[in-house]
Amino acid sequence: TPVISSAASDVYKRQLGLPDVDGDADVIIAPIPYELTTSYGQGTAEGPAACIAASGQVELFDHKLGQELPAGKKIRTVQPWSGEGNTLQEQLNGIGEYAAEQYNSGAFPIFLGGEHGILPGILRGCPKKVTLVQIDAHADLRDELDGEPYSHACAIARSLDEGAIAVHQVGIRAYCKQEADLIESDERIFTWFARDVMNPTTGGGRWLEWLESLKQIDGPVHLTIDIDGLDGSLVPATGTPVPGGLSFWHVDQTIDVLFENCDVISADVNEIVAQLDTPLTEFTAAMIATKIISAYILSLIHI
Protein backbone atom coordinates (compact mmCIF):
# COMPACT_ATOMS: atom_id res chain seq x y z
CA THR A 1 0.00 0.00 0.00
CA PRO A 2 1.41 3.43 -0.89
CA VAL A 3 2.48 5.58 2.03
CA ILE A 4 0.94 9.03 2.06
CA SER A 5 2.26 11.70 4.36
CA SER A 6 0.20 11.89 7.53
CA ALA A 7 1.14 15.55 7.68
CA ALA A 8 -1.66 16.43 5.25
CA SER A 9 -2.13 19.89 3.87
CA ASP A 10 -2.32 21.84 7.12
CA VAL A 11 1.36 21.20 7.86
CA TYR A 12 2.53 22.45 4.48
CA LYS A 13 4.11 25.86 4.61
CA ARG A 14 4.87 28.01 1.58
CA GLN A 15 8.01 27.74 -0.50
CA LEU A 16 10.70 30.17 0.72
CA GLY A 17 8.31 31.31 3.44
CA LEU A 18 6.74 33.71 0.95
CA PRO A 19 3.20 34.99 1.49
CA ASP A 20 0.36 33.58 -0.59
CA VAL A 21 -0.36 35.34 -3.87
CA ASP A 22 -3.54 36.48 -5.58
CA GLY A 23 -4.33 35.83 -9.21
CA ASP A 24 -2.41 33.68 -11.65
CA ALA A 25 0.96 32.40 -10.45
CA ASP A 26 4.17 32.28 -12.47
CA VAL A 27 5.62 29.31 -10.57
CA ILE A 28 3.75 26.56 -8.76
CA ILE A 29 5.26 24.34 -6.06
CA ALA A 30 3.29 21.09 -6.11
CA PRO A 31 4.01 18.55 -3.33
CA ILE A 32 3.49 14.85 -4.11
CA PRO A 33 4.02 13.02 -0.78
CA TYR A 34 4.15 9.54 -2.29
CA GLU A 35 6.13 6.49 -1.22
CA LEU A 36 5.51 2.99 -2.44
CA THR A 37 8.67 1.21 -3.52
CA THR A 38 11.68 2.92 -1.91
CA SER A 39 14.47 0.35 -1.54
CA TYR A 40 16.54 1.47 1.42
CA GLY A 41 15.85 4.68 3.29
CA GLN A 42 12.23 5.24 4.25
CA GLY A 43 10.35 8.50 4.74
CA THR A 44 10.10 10.00 1.24
CA ALA A 45 6.38 10.65 1.85
CA GLU A 46 7.42 13.27 4.40
CA GLY A 47 10.01 14.78 2.05
CA PRO A 48 7.98 17.51 0.33
CA ALA A 49 6.84 19.08 3.60
CA ALA A 50 10.40 18.94 4.97
CA CYS A 51 11.79 20.55 1.81
CA ILE A 52 9.24 23.36 1.88
CA ALA A 53 9.85 23.98 5.58
CA ALA A 54 13.63 24.08 4.98
CA SER A 55 13.18 26.53 2.12
CA GLY A 56 12.17 29.16 4.65
CA GLN A 57 15.86 29.31 5.63
CA VAL A 58 17.15 29.73 2.06
CA GLU A 59 18.40 33.21 1.17
CA LEU A 60 16.10 34.97 -1.28
CA PHE A 61 18.85 36.91 -3.10
CA ASP A 62 20.01 35.41 -6.38
CA HIS A 63 23.22 36.78 -7.85
CA LYS A 64 22.19 36.19 -11.45
CA LEU A 65 18.83 37.86 -10.97
CA GLY A 66 20.52 40.64 -9.03
CA GLN A 67 17.55 40.81 -6.69
CA GLU A 68 15.61 38.80 -4.15
CA LEU A 69 12.95 36.30 -5.02
CA PRO A 70 10.17 36.42 -6.02
CA ALA A 71 11.70 39.15 -8.23
CA GLY A 72 8.33 40.61 -9.14
CA LYS A 73 6.84 37.23 -10.01
CA LYS A 74 4.23 35.15 -8.20
CA ILE A 75 5.21 31.86 -6.55
CA ARG A 76 2.39 29.73 -5.17
CA THR A 77 2.61 26.56 -3.09
CA VAL A 78 -0.52 24.55 -3.86
CA GLN A 79 -2.22 21.89 -1.80
CA PRO A 80 -0.44 18.52 -1.95
CA TRP A 81 -1.63 15.57 -3.98
CA SER A 82 -4.29 13.83 -1.93
CA GLY A 83 -3.15 10.25 -2.33
CA GLU A 84 -6.52 8.90 -3.43
CA GLY A 85 -6.54 5.53 -5.20
CA ASN A 86 -6.52 1.94 -4.02
CA THR A 87 -4.06 0.49 -6.53
CA LEU A 88 -0.70 1.61 -7.88
CA GLN A 89 -2.14 2.50 -11.28
CA GLU A 90 -4.97 4.45 -9.65
CA GLN A 91 -2.36 6.32 -7.62
CA LEU A 92 -0.33 7.13 -10.75
CA ASN A 93 -3.45 8.22 -12.62
CA GLY A 94 -4.30 10.43 -9.65
CA ILE A 95 -0.83 11.97 -9.79
CA GLY A 96 -1.42 12.51 -13.50
CA GLU A 97 -4.67 14.36 -12.83
CA TYR A 98 -2.99 16.44 -10.14
CA ALA A 99 -0.10 17.25 -12.48
CA ALA A 100 -2.50 18.18 -15.28
CA GLU A 101 -4.12 20.76 -13.00
CA GLN A 102 -0.74 22.40 -12.47
CA TYR A 103 0.21 22.36 -16.16
CA ASN A 104 -3.20 23.75 -17.12
CA SER A 105 -2.78 26.68 -14.73
CA GLY A 106 -0.26 28.21 -17.12
CA ALA A 107 2.39 28.44 -14.39
CA PHE A 108 5.73 26.63 -14.35
CA PRO A 109 5.24 23.59 -12.09
CA ILE A 110 7.91 22.19 -9.78
CA PHE A 111 6.81 18.89 -8.28
CA LEU A 112 8.34 17.81 -4.96
CA GLY A 113 8.51 14.11 -4.09
CA GLY A 114 8.14 11.66 -2.74
CA GLU A 115 9.88 8.82 -4.47
CA HIS A 116 11.03 8.86 -8.11
CA GLY A 117 8.12 6.58 -8.99
CA ILE A 118 6.02 9.75 -9.26
CA LEU A 119 7.60 10.58 -12.64
CA PRO A 120 5.44 8.39 -14.93
CA GLY A 121 2.39 9.82 -13.17
CA ILE A 122 3.56 13.39 -13.70
CA LEU A 123 4.11 12.72 -17.39
CA ARG A 124 0.59 11.30 -17.71
CA GLY A 125 -0.61 14.79 -16.86
CA CYS A 126 1.87 16.63 -19.07
CA PRO A 127 0.25 18.10 -22.21
CA LYS A 128 3.42 17.72 -24.32
CA LYS A 129 5.83 14.95 -25.22
CA VAL A 130 9.06 15.81 -23.45
CA THR A 131 12.73 14.98 -23.42
CA LEU A 132 13.85 14.11 -19.90
CA VAL A 133 16.99 15.53 -18.35
CA GLN A 134 17.77 13.36 -15.34
CA ILE A 135 20.18 13.94 -12.46
CA ASP A 136 20.44 10.68 -10.54
CA ALA A 137 22.74 8.10 -8.99
CA HIS A 138 20.64 5.35 -10.54
CA ALA A 139 19.73 4.78 -14.17
CA ASP A 140 16.13 3.86 -13.16
CA LEU A 141 15.91 1.76 -16.32
CA ARG A 142 15.10 -1.59 -14.75
CA ASP A 143 12.27 -3.55 -16.32
CA GLU A 144 11.08 -4.45 -12.83
CA LEU A 145 12.27 -4.59 -9.22
CA ASP A 146 10.92 -7.27 -6.90
CA GLY A 147 8.23 -7.97 -9.48
CA GLU A 148 7.02 -4.35 -9.68
CA PRO A 149 7.43 -2.69 -13.11
CA TYR A 150 6.46 0.72 -11.69
CA SER A 151 9.05 0.68 -8.92
CA HIS A 152 11.11 3.83 -8.39
CA ALA A 153 13.95 1.83 -9.97
CA CYS A 154 11.94 1.65 -13.21
CA ALA A 155 10.82 5.29 -13.38
CA ILE A 156 12.74 6.26 -16.52
CA ALA A 157 12.02 2.99 -18.33
CA ARG A 158 8.29 3.41 -17.74
CA SER A 159 8.45 7.09 -18.70
CA LEU A 160 10.03 6.13 -22.03
CA ASP A 161 7.37 3.44 -22.48
CA GLU A 162 4.66 6.02 -21.87
CA GLY A 163 5.93 8.51 -24.42
CA ALA A 164 8.98 10.44 -23.25
CA ILE A 165 11.05 11.21 -26.36
CA ALA A 166 14.49 10.57 -24.87
CA VAL A 167 16.47 10.86 -21.65
CA HIS A 168 19.77 12.59 -21.01
CA GLN A 169 21.03 11.36 -17.64
CA VAL A 170 24.05 12.37 -15.58
CA GLY A 171 25.60 11.27 -12.29
CA ILE A 172 24.75 7.62 -12.93
CA ARG A 173 26.86 5.24 -10.82
CA ALA A 174 24.56 2.44 -9.63
CA TYR A 175 22.90 0.20 -12.20
CA CYS A 176 22.48 -3.44 -13.13
CA LYS A 177 23.57 -5.47 -16.17
CA GLN A 178 20.14 -5.21 -17.79
CA GLU A 179 20.32 -1.42 -17.51
CA ALA A 180 23.88 -1.34 -18.87
CA ASP A 181 22.75 -3.33 -21.91
CA LEU A 182 19.78 -1.00 -22.44
CA ILE A 183 22.00 2.09 -22.23
CA GLU A 184 24.18 0.59 -24.97
CA SER A 185 21.32 -0.47 -27.24
CA ASP A 186 18.54 2.14 -26.88
CA GLU A 187 19.13 5.23 -29.02
CA ARG A 188 16.77 7.26 -26.81
CA ILE A 189 19.11 6.99 -23.81
CA PHE A 190 22.15 9.27 -23.40
CA THR A 191 24.09 8.48 -20.23
CA TRP A 192 26.92 10.41 -18.60
CA PHE A 193 28.37 8.28 -15.84
CA ALA A 194 29.64 9.79 -12.59
CA ARG A 195 32.93 7.91 -13.02
CA ASP A 196 33.52 9.95 -16.20
CA VAL A 197 32.29 13.44 -15.32
CA MET A 198 33.79 13.24 -11.80
CA ASN A 199 37.10 11.70 -12.91
CA PRO A 200 39.91 13.63 -11.13
CA THR A 201 42.04 13.91 -14.29
CA THR A 202 39.63 13.94 -17.24
CA GLY A 203 36.28 14.79 -15.67
CA GLY A 204 36.40 18.48 -16.54
CA GLY A 205 36.38 17.80 -20.25
CA ARG A 206 33.61 15.23 -19.97
CA TRP A 207 31.55 17.65 -17.91
CA LEU A 208 31.81 20.29 -20.62
CA GLU A 209 30.68 17.68 -23.14
CA TRP A 210 27.61 17.02 -20.97
CA LEU A 211 26.74 20.71 -20.90
CA GLU A 212 27.21 21.02 -24.67
CA SER A 213 24.95 18.02 -25.23
CA LEU A 214 22.14 19.77 -23.36
CA LYS A 215 22.30 22.69 -25.75
CA GLN A 216 21.42 20.36 -28.63
CA ILE A 217 18.08 19.23 -27.18
CA ASP A 218 15.09 20.30 -29.26
CA GLY A 219 11.54 20.57 -27.99
CA PRO A 220 10.03 20.62 -24.50
CA VAL A 221 12.16 19.41 -21.59
CA HIS A 222 11.20 18.07 -18.17
CA LEU A 223 14.00 18.22 -15.59
CA THR A 224 13.87 15.36 -13.09
CA ILE A 225 16.26 15.50 -10.14
CA ASP A 226 16.65 12.57 -7.80
CA ILE A 227 18.69 14.17 -5.06
CA ASP A 228 20.80 11.04 -4.68
CA GLY A 229 22.45 12.23 -7.89
CA LEU A 230 24.43 14.49 -5.59
CA ASP A 231 27.20 13.03 -3.50
CA GLY A 232 25.94 11.18 -0.46
CA SER A 233 27.77 13.60 1.85
CA LEU A 234 25.34 16.32 0.72
CA VAL A 235 22.18 14.24 0.93
CA PRO A 236 22.66 11.60 3.64
CA ALA A 237 18.90 11.18 4.07
CA THR A 238 17.54 10.05 0.73
CA GLY A 239 15.82 6.93 -0.55
CA THR A 240 19.05 5.22 -1.66
CA PRO A 241 22.20 7.28 -0.92
CA VAL A 242 25.30 6.54 -3.04
CA PRO A 243 28.83 8.01 -2.67
CA GLY A 244 30.76 9.43 -5.60
CA GLY A 245 28.13 11.81 -6.90
CA LEU A 246 27.82 15.33 -8.23
CA SER A 247 28.56 18.47 -6.27
CA PHE A 248 25.91 21.12 -5.71
CA TRP A 249 27.64 23.28 -8.32
CA HIS A 250 27.39 20.57 -10.97
CA VAL A 251 23.63 20.59 -10.46
CA ASP A 252 23.53 24.39 -10.35
CA GLN A 253 25.39 24.63 -13.66
CA THR A 254 23.20 22.02 -15.32
CA ILE A 255 20.11 24.02 -14.36
CA ASP A 256 21.64 27.24 -15.71
CA VAL A 257 22.58 25.71 -19.06
CA LEU A 258 19.19 24.06 -19.46
CA PHE A 259 17.16 27.19 -18.84
CA GLU A 260 19.48 29.33 -20.96
CA ASN A 261 19.25 27.02 -23.98
CA CYS A 262 16.18 24.79 -23.77
CA ASP A 263 12.40 24.96 -23.49
CA VAL A 264 12.07 23.64 -19.93
CA ILE A 265 8.36 23.30 -19.17
CA SER A 266 8.47 21.61 -15.74
CA ALA A 267 10.69 19.99 -13.13
CA ASP A 268 10.62 17.66 -10.18
CA VAL A 269 12.91 17.18 -7.18
CA ASN A 270 12.41 13.83 -5.51
CA GLU A 271 13.62 11.16 -3.06
CA ILE A 272 13.80 13.74 -0.26
CA VAL A 273 13.75 12.25 3.23
CA ALA A 274 13.35 14.36 6.36
CA GLN A 275 16.15 13.78 8.86
CA LEU A 276 15.83 14.56 12.54
CA ASP A 277 19.50 14.95 13.49
CA THR A 278 20.49 17.23 10.58
CA PRO A 279 18.42 19.16 8.04
CA LEU A 280 21.16 18.95 5.38
CA THR A 281 19.24 16.76 2.92
CA GLU A 282 16.03 18.77 2.87
CA PHE A 283 17.98 22.04 2.86
CA THR A 284 20.00 20.88 -0.15
CA ALA A 285 16.77 19.91 -1.90
CA ALA A 286 15.26 23.29 -1.01
CA MET A 287 18.27 25.10 -2.48
CA ILE A 288 17.95 23.09 -5.70
CA ALA A 289 14.23 23.86 -5.98
CA THR A 290 15.01 27.53 -5.34
CA LYS A 291 17.68 27.46 -8.05
CA ILE A 292 15.11 26.11 -10.51
CA ILE A 293 12.73 28.94 -9.57
CA SER A 294 15.46 31.54 -10.08
CA ALA A 295 16.56 30.08 -13.42
CA TYR A 296 12.98 30.01 -14.69
CA ILE A 297 12.32 33.61 -13.62
CA LEU A 298 15.59 34.69 -15.23
CA SER A 299 14.49 33.02 -18.47
CA LEU A 300 11.26 35.05 -18.37
CA ILE A 301 13.21 38.27 -17.97
CA HIS A 302 15.42 37.38 -20.95
CA ILE A 303 12.56 36.50 -23.31
Where are these regions (language model features)?
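Short, electropositive alpha-helical surface patch
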Residues: G85-L88, L92-I95, I183-D196, A274-I297
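Active-site rim beta-loop-alpha module in soluble metabolic enzymes
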Residues: A166-P236
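Active-site flanking residues adjacent to catalytic metal/cofactor-binding acidic residues
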Residues: A30, G114, I135, V170, ...
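Single conserved hydrophobic/aromatic residue that forms the stacking wall/gate
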Residues: T1-A8, Y12, I301-H302
